[in-house]
Amino acid sequence: MATRAAEELVVLLDEGGRPAGTMPKAEVHGTDTPLHLAFSVYLFDSGGRLLVTRRALQKRTWPGVWTNSCCGHPGPGEDPAAAAERRLGQELGLRPDRLELVLPEFTYRAVAADGIVEHERCPVFFAWVDGDPEPPPTPDPEEVADWRWVPWASFRAVATTAPWALSPWSVEQVAALPA
């Protein structure tokens, strides 16, 4: 993970959301994290269940926390939708049948208990796999500690009644999404 993060570039953004440079991913997250481009994906099966993941314990931000299906950063010049599909494959071993942008301008800033800041312009996607995913998810252990399929209504309920149990971005995203 450290090697991949050191090589991966994150797109920095100005206050208007325009690209303003790049920074190695390994250096971007700290106590004064600059605004940068990311994305979030909520992956559903044909029964309407959401794939939730528990972040790996070695993650720099919010280790061990339950969250949406997949998150990541588009590379310089990479379309966020293409990056979302790429990361679903890398993190979960899955390829979506459909992908839809549902919150194009979502932006948030969150401070973890250890002072590490996330500050992202984070387009949010819904993705679907038709039928039961074959093969089932095969998560990258450097990214995902655990996973399960849950009803969307249950995830929304947890985000509302026990927000401390989820990543701060997923709580804010769920609040911004239609019921």
PLM-predicted stretches and their roles:
Residues 2-40, 44-46:
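Acidic, metal-coordinating catalytic segment for phosphate/diphosphate chemistry
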Residues 36, 94-96, 120:
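Short gly/pro-enriched beta-turn/loop segments at secondary-structure junctions
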Residues 52, 69-103, 125:
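The catalytic Nudix box helix
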Residues 34, 59, 63, 67, ...:
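Hydrophobic alpha-helical segments and helix-packing faces
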Residues 24-27, 64, 76, 105-179:
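Nudix hydrolase/Nudix homology domain
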Residues 15, 55, 152:
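Residues immediately flanking
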Residues 19-22, 48-54, 134-139:
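Short, well-ordered strand-loop elements centered on a beta-strand within folded domains, enriched
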Residues 38-71:
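A glycine-rich, hydrophobic loop/mini-helix early in the fold
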